[in-house]
Design a protein with these regions (language model features):
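Short glycine/acidic-enriched loop and turn motifs that connect beta-strands
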Residues: 280-282, 333-336
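Short coil/linker segments at helix-helix boundaries
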Residues: 61-62, 92, 96-97, 104, ...
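Blade-edge motifs of beta-propeller repeat domains
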Residues: 221-256, 288-309, 343-350
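TPR repeat positional signature
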Residues: 92, 99, 144, 151, ...
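N-terminal leader/linker segments that initiate helical-solenoid repeat arrays
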Residues: 16-89, 93-97, 101, 161, ...
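Beta-propeller blade termini
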Residues: 250, 258-268, 289, 311-324, ...
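Helix-turn-helix repeat elements of alpha-solenoid scaffolds
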Residues: 63-81, 111-125, 181-189, 237
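Hydrophobic beta-strand segments that make up the repeating blades of beta-propeller
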Residues: 261, 271-278, 323, 327-332
Length: 350
């Protein structure tokens, strides 16, 4: 059955898992202990069709969507195959790792609750079998950190995105920015403390423990003294002033992924406009025209940007010296190669 499955699609197994440490996402040969990434990028990469034309932005988007549609069901089927083996011949480390890979894939699509469930399943196996398999014993600290990160991100989505308000996720967290839905940060603190009990030298997890407590209004007293960061760690000697979040009122409140921004006067009316790109290969670049009075109106389609998909970064330049500011969009560098774009401005912001 497993052989048939392997002919249908890629499967994340011991033979083809991403070229990183079995449990830790630290690159081989490095000496530092870094926080475990919960993104699923490496895992989804196994399912991406690398042969797609990097010059065709639309087919790259389609390939990513196909990979997402394939990855989770394929891994779930592989897990069923592993669990169908007789109890005495099961590879529990491989079963735990498959739960972990499913958790990463769920994280990739933004389902952090389901991601945490899969990480937790791997963690329970590691706890139960640690005495018989050193791989599972070694898995406990990184899994604890991974579960904590997944829950912290879940809390961020539930409070900073789904329940967004002006003070959401502005660091350091003040009273108005505290989480109203608290289970994410509460569970994160639980697993960060478990991790620190095993690896007290991990400063990144210690930092995240204090951050999680801050989102709940429990810093500093809610953090055990041994792990408590001093208050000066969250303050600055500089005084840059205060910036209020006004994106919603300005017409700029959109939800997307990280990307680039190039702010310039693209239509020559004397007011600066905003061009943004997104690392999501299925999301188009956007152009917001400054309408004056602190308000912006979207002109993405009118500017011919609907098919300008993806973009790690963007910068403005007048490449042809016609006096109109153009935009250069840079892509690729993560999951797959993608072409760049040089967008010529016709002088009307198009």
């Amino acid at each position: 059955m497993l052989a048939a499955l392997l002919t249908l699609s890629a499967v994340l197994t011991a033979q083809n898992r991403p070229a990183i440490d079995f449990w830790n996402r630290r690159a081989p040969g490095t000496e530092y202990e870094s926080i475990l990434e919960v993104s699923g990028r490496e895992e989804l990469g196994v399912f991406l069709q690398r042969a797609r034309d990097p010059r065709n932005l639309r087919t790259i988007c389609e390939g990513r969507l196909e990979a997402i549609d394939t990855a989770i069901p394929t891994q779930q089927q592989y897990l069923k195959t592993l669990l169908a083996q007789p109890q005495q011949s099961r590879d529990f480390a491989e079963i735990a790792w498959t739960h972990r890979s499913l958790g990463q894939l769920w994280a990739y699509v933004g389902q952090l609750g389901r991601a945490a469930e899969e990480f937790d399943a791997a963690y329970r196996i590691a706890l139960e079998r640690q005495s018989t398999d050193p791989r599972l014993r070694d898995a406990l600290p990184p899994l604890e950190a991974m579960i904590g990160v997944a829950h912290l991100r879940r809390g961020e989505l539930e409070n900073c995105v789904d329940n967004h308000q002006a003070m959401s996720c502005i660091f350091p967290i003040r009273e108005q920015g505290r989480h109203q839905r608290t289970s994410g940060s509460e569970r994160a603190m639980e697993f960060f403390l478990k991790h620190l009990a095993r690896q007290p030298e991990n400063l990144e997890v210690r930092w995240l423990l204090n951050l999680a407590a801050m989102t709940l209004g429990r810093y500093p007293d809610g953090v055990p003294e041994r792990w408590r960061m001093p208050a000066k760690a969250f303050t600055s000697e500089e005084n840059p002033g205060r910036f209020d979040e006004v994106a919603h009122e300005a017409g700029l409140h959109t939800i997307g992924r990280a990307g680039g921004a190039a702010i310039e006067d693209y239509d020559g009316d004397g007011r600066v406009d905003i061009f943004v790109s997104s690392t999501d290969p299925c999301a188009s670049a956007r152009l917001y025209r400054n309408a004056g009075g602190g308000h912006f109106e979207e002109r993405t389609e009118a500017a011919g940007l609907k098919e300008q998909l993806g973009g790690l970064n963007a910068t403005h330049t007048d490449y042809n010296n016609d006096g109109f500011i153009d935009v250069f969009v840079m892509r690729g560098g993560w999951e797959y190669p993608m072409r760049n774009s040089l967008l010529r401005n016709d002088g009307k912001g198009n």
